[in-house]
Amino acid sequence: MELDLICRDLGVVDYAETWERMKQFTQIRSKDDADEIWLLEHPSLFTQGQAGKEEHLLAPGDIPVIQVDRGGQVTYHGPGQLVAYVMVDLKRLGIGVRDLVSVLENSVVRALALNAIEAYPKPDAPGVYVDEQKIASLGLRVRRGCSFHGLALNVDMDLTPFNRINPCGYQGLQMVDMKRLNKGVILSNVKAQLANQLAEQLGYNYPAIQQGWK
């Protein structure tokens, strides 16, 4: 049975609720359930991954910090950052975790190229970079052979909260967003571009984007 990729546009949603829905989706899905990508933004918060160290939280202040079950260290989420949660059956796709990381990175690089931004991944530091500045962060978890969590692409956002942490555990790492590199960037366009690139890299047709959870 050939399955389509389901892609959902969820708008701005609470992190804790979305995290719980991801875990539930992954726990109960069967081998016959379609893979899904959730596109969304979160209100301001820091998330600390499984490898996270307290010393990289420099001065969180009034921004909440949530300890989560993804890989990686601390990062910031906020309005104007496009988050893509990628829930795919790795075994069914015939790929491993490292392959999925490459899919996410290559999808971001291609979406950025469509906006006249030249970017690249780094083999020793997952994510996507422009002139040594980080524009997209990755963090994944695999359970029962299926992935959840995903990537965060800085589109048009306030980057100052990143100064309160060592992003992804790297002291002095500079962050950048698309708007600073291309004034014509529109988040809704980037959303569709990223969805299409993710689908193509995963071997799917371009998806119709559904609004909301259902």
Swiss-Prot record:
Keywords: Acyltransferase, Cytoplasm, Transferase
CDD domains listed in its UniProt record: LipB
Enzyme's top EC category: transferase
Location of the protein in the cell: Cytoplasm
Catalytic activity: octanoyl-[ACP] + L-lysyl-[protein] = N(6)-octanoyl-L-lysyl-[protein] + holo-[ACP] + H(+)
Site features described as Lowers pKa of active site Cys, chain residue numbers: K134
Pathways involved: Protein modification; protein lipoylation via endogenous pathway; protein N(6)-(lipoyl)lysine from octanoyl-[acyl-carrier-protein]: step 1/2
Binding of substrate, residues: R70, G71, G72, Q73, V74, T75, Y76, H77, S137, L138, G139, G150, L151, A152
Disulfide bonding pattern of the chain: none
MF-aspect GO terms: lipoyl(octanoyl) transferase activity
GO biological process, one term: protein modification process
Family statement: Belongs to the LipB family.
Further comment found in the protein's record: In the reaction, the free carboxyl group of octanoic acid is attached via an amide linkage to the epsilon-amino group of a specific lysine residue of lipoyl domains of lipoate-dependent enzymes.
Protein name: Octanoyltransferase
Organism: Marinomonas sp. (strain MWYL1)
